[in-house]
């Protein structure tokens, strides 16, 4: 099945509110297009230092009640840093406790600020040991990494190649820490776009078969003439740019962003109809012994067929996990065609 991560929504696992698990609970009980593919209970930057322990407690307390009904995957972001042993020690403790107490409700963990490949291997070893101590099957917990340091960027290819025989399932770009580590400056209020890095991330993750996720967009709201309004256009521009260069999903900081990114990273009605028309025609041609066929002026052969098939397989994956989203987004006849068409690979 196609691995879905259109949305990577971080939610502080503890905040200074009467209900400190407010945002965690909101993510776990989200519905419709506001449900992320990956929910990331955040123990790291999103949670104040004084509330880290409470953040872990909240995850342990809330997951048994809410995780069974949550449609997406759950991967907490723990503390970690390639250049700080204390952070790695705390992260190890967090992984071990969560795997032991709620491991059956987790799909994996997110490790921030990893360094070179040796540090990635260390993080993978922490997960493997936590699985053993918790009595979980080997490989039950996946690992996602946040690419936000110069050493990790230098070893990007090696890290992605490590994924081919490991539990590594996703790489996420962290532009704020990366810019700071490189000494970058936000001149004129504009941050770097890092197009070269994103294109490399898209290429290397595609070659390794892991998902690539873009960085956060923190300009959530604008204010004008005393009115504050959600910056939907700015976020959509970033997500659409990521989608055009093959980034699989986008970082979300807010349910409104999740709803936008879920839709943008979803084949449009026109894309799906076009893919189905060409798949159906090519299937007929193959049955008649023809290796290629012209459909709507385009030559469709095995290579282009796979591109159209990927569109259909993504829709099927979304429908498997989020049927309310596909039911709202596509008309019934088109969705039925997508679910029933034969997808043939040589």
Question: How does the language model describe each region?
Answer:
Residues 1-346:
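Expand to "…catalyze enediolate/carbanion chemistry for C-C bond making/breaking, isomerization
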